[in-house]
């Protein structure tokens, strides 16, 4: 693994330290000469602060550094400048309340929405601006407006999950804060501190123990960014649908697109209507445009229709649905396989990707008064930030999601293990993620 100077995730939580028997008193003789501030650990210094917020410049710097690490390195002749701008800031309460009262703001996490513009792509990053859990929560290089109900709900769920993982870290720090502060007093180093984190504090932490593990070194992400609209659905019937973007047809279906992208990665031999699927042609361009050749449209259209038929997809004008285990059925038709459905598990994803196997993920909403929200997509990469400092080990896990929306909203999302429960805009999720790991040829 490569050692990096890592602005991206400035801090995680140091182990709980032994406290003095009497928090009000020092554990050393008051006449003892004060030791250097360097004898305090980073987290002991943080425990003495009365304000944990990072400066906006530090927030922007973290996004810039993450972009350098997470994005492919273009040639110098084509490299564009990354323009960053803070669009909004939301204080999220440690209890998980989306918006805090004035009293609650005294101990809340500021979440920054940072707009990213580079070349012809316009995306965003979500960033925690609190030193207790300063990290990138989501990094999305390209995002269109959230114009469909499905996109809005699924992206909201992923954002909420990333924020939830962040809140847990801050909450844990609060449980050991007094112990850390008392240890600092025991070292007889009590001094006034700025209300804001100084840049030197961040730079010191950057020089300590960060290592990055990145799946791209051994497993490239998908080369295609397909979607559900035209021309992917061009072989479905026109039956009075009103969406012009879909050529007045039913959408191809998220489950169908996820399966199609998995097949494209492994290129199994497949004949549809007596004609072999030309994977090389299909993958020549990242996306297939509406202006593509008739031959290319036929290839992608018949592939999507074939998968839909094998998966027994139910086509409706507003959404096309497949069963949660449809991928198991379709893969079996082309000499491929995957694991049975399991709840989201980081180790399964990590091992699957390292073994050269994609992972299908899905989020399933429960019945509610609005409508059921389900989505399937492909996890095709990961990023791990490993932190080893003063006998304390911590990791932050990111998965790279290819969401099947023509590349829009694909990116790295900070996620934790299964068991997250929350409600967003009337849609309840009892279990955020399920996965089919180890997609591969038999």
PLM feature spans:
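Active-site-adjacent substructure of cysteine-protease-like catalytic cores
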Residues: 98-121, 337-398
């Amino acid at each position: 693994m490569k050692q990096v100077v890592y602005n991206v995730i400035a801090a995680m939580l140091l182990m709980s330290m032994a406290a003095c028997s009497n928090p009000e008193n020092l554990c050393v003789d008051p006449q003892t000469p004060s030791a250097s501030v360097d004898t305090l650990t980073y987290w002991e210094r943080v425990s003495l602060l009365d304000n944990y917020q990072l400066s906006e410049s530090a927030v922007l710097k973290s996004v810039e550094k993450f972009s350098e690490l997470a994005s492919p390195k273009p040639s110098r002749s084509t490299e564009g400048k990354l323009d960053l701008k803070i669009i909004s800031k939301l204080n999220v309460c440690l209890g998980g309340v989306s918006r805090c009262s004035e009293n609650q703001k005294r101990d809340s996490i500021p979440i920054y929405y940072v707009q990213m513009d580079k070349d012809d792509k316009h995306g965003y990053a979500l960033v925690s601006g609190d030193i207790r859990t300063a990290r990138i929560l989501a990094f999305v290089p390209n995002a269109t407006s959230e114009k469909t109900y499905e996109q809005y709900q699924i992206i909201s769920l992923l954002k909420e999950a990333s924020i939830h993982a962040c809140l847990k870290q801050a909450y844990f720090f609060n449980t050991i804060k007094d112990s850390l502060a008392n240890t600092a007093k025991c070292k007889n180093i009590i001094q006034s501190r700025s209300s804001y984190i100084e840049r030197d504090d961040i730079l010191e932490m950057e020089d300590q123990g960060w290592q990055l593990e990145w799946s791209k070194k051994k497993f490239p992400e998908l080369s295609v960014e397909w979607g559900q609209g035209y021309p992917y659905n061009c072989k479905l019937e026109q039956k009075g649908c009103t969406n012009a973007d879909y050529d007045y047809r039913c959408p191809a279906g998220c489950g169908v697109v996820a399966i199609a992208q998995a097949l494209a990665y492994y290129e199994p031999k497949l004949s549809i209507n007596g004609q072999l699927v030309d994977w090389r042609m299909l993958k020549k361009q990242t996306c297939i445009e509406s202006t593509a050749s008739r031959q290319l449209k036929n290839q992608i259209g018949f592939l999507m229709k074939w998968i839909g038929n094998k998966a027994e997809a139910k086509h409706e004008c507003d959404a096309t649905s497949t069963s949660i285990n449809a991928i198991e059925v379709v893969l079996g038709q082309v000499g491929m396989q995957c694991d049975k459905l399991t709840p989201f598990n980081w180790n399964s994803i990590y091992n699957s990707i390292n073994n050269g196997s994609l992972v299908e993920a899905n989020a399933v909403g429960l019945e509610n008064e609005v409508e059921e929200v389900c989505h399937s997509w492909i996890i095709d990469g990961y990023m791990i930030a490993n932190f080893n400092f003063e006998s304390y080990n911590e990791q932050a896990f990111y998965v790279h999601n290819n969401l099947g929306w023509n590349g829009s909203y694909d990116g790295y999302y900070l996620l934790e293990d299964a068991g997250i429960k929350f409600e967003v805009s009337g849609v309840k999720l009892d279990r955020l993620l399920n996965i089919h790991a180890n997609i591969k040829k038999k």
